């Protein structure tokens, strides 16, 4: 089945696997998905990711992180902001702060995919893809 919004699909797969306490989840591979996974890993929301498969069958295997003996998910929520039907852009002065800096906004800029903090530091704006906290 064709997916109209691969970013929302990726976020939903992560959210569902995290709520079900799965150790890993599989998402279709793309450069954008890989970039988002790199940001999530760098910010400590996922443990690791690896690419597997060949050609059209490529996918990313994301290792999720949990804390405590009750295995509470590190990712509390993921929210898609810019959607195919309504794109949301932000200039460098109006970049959003998620929960006062506790969470992150993932931004697609001319310099690549990065967090709101990195975009502010580099002085660039872009499309606000999602919030993670």
From Swiss-Prot:
Disulfide bonds: none
Gene3D superfamilies: 3.30.1370.30, 3.30.1490.10
Keywords carried by this UniProt record: Ribonucleoprotein, Ribosomal protein, RNA-binding, rRNA-binding
Sequence similarity: Belongs to the universal ribosomal protein uS8 family.
Molecular function via GO: rRNA binding; structural constituent of ribosome
Top-level taxonomic group: Bacteria
Name of the molecule in the record: Small ribosomal subunit protein uS8
Record PANTHER family: 40S RIBOSOMAL PROTEIN S15A
Database matches in InterPro entries: Ribosomal_uS8, Ribosomal_uS8_CS, Ribosomal_uS8_sf
Biological function: One of the primary rRNA binding proteins, it binds directly to 16S rRNA central domain where it helps coordinate assembly of the platform of the 30S subunit.
Pfam families membership: Ribosomal_S8
UniProt-listed GO biological process terms: translation
CC terms in the record's Gene Ontology section: ribonucleoprotein complex; ribosome
Quaternary structure and interacting proteins, as annotated: Part of the 30S ribosomal subunit. Contacts proteins S5 and S12.
